[in-house]
């Protein structure tokens, strides 16, 4: 965006995931992620973890799967000095997820992923993330997308709502 003639970025995300395809039933994977989000007072977040995923059902209609993992999360927040929430935390979390990919026809794909991430040994500290995306083919390389995101934190930082949602439209280019 632009503010006062200067460009700025209010959020950023870098994510890497490696999934190993040893067999069709159990797929081990690991990932690492860095991000920040000024609207959530998040100066820095680093996450790394690993686990397994599997597909329960698949066919021409799409795919349904799930996974479980353990992850290490480190966050640094931009909080006022009077904040109750700690401004820097490191926590081990479970990460469980469900994935769904529906293909009603060759020009439409609906995907959904829901994560539930309780603190390891602190099940009252839960984060839930959900994404639903509809992609409609425009050309072989271009899709029009509509995405809905939901984020819930049972212990949000001071001044931040426990529930956050967003609706976005976009174009996805694949080459």
Predicted regions and their residues:
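Membrane-embedded beta-strands of outer-membrane beta-barrel proteins
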Residues: 14-16, 50, 96-98, 114, ...
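Transmembrane beta-strands of outer-membrane beta-barrel pores
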Residues: 1, 32-38, 54, 70-76, ...
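Repeated loop/turn-to-beta-strand initiation elements of outer-membrane beta-barrel proteins
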Residues: 25-28, 60-64, 102-110, 136-146
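Gram-negative (and chloroplast) outer-membrane scaffold detector with strong preference
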Residues: 24-73
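Outer-membrane beta-barrel "beta-signal"
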Residues: 134-137, 163-175
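Outer-membrane beta-barrel domain signature
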Residues: 2-7, 37-43, 55-59, 79-88, ...
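Residues that define the transmembrane beta-barrel architecture of outer-membrane proteins
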Residues: 8-12, 44-48, 62, 88-94, ...
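Membrane-embedded beta-strand positions of outer-membrane beta-barrel proteins
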Residues: 30-32, 66-68, 96-98, 112-114, ...
């Amino acid at each position: 965006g632009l503010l006062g003639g200067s460009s700025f970025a209010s959020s950023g995300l870098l994510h890497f995931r490696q999934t190993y395809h040893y067999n069709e039933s159990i797929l081990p994977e690991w990932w690492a992620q860095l991000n920040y989000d000024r609207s959530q007072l998040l100066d820095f977040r680093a996450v790394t973890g690993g686990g397994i995923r599997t597909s329960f059902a698949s066919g021409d209609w799409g795919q349904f799967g799930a996974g479980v993992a353990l992850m290490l999360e480190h966050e640094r927040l931009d909080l006022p000095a009077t904040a109750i929430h700690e401004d820097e935390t490191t926590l081990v979390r479970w990460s469980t997820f469900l994935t769904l990919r529906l293909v009603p026809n060759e020009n439409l794909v609906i995907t959904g992923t829901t994560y539930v991430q309780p603190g390891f040994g602190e099940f009252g500290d839960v984060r839930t993330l959900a994404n639903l995306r509809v992609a409609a083919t425009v050309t072989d390389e271009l899709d029009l997308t509509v995405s809905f995101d939901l984020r819930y934190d049972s212990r949000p930082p001071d001044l931040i709502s426990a529930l956050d949602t967003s609706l976005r439209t976009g174009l996805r280019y694949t080459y």
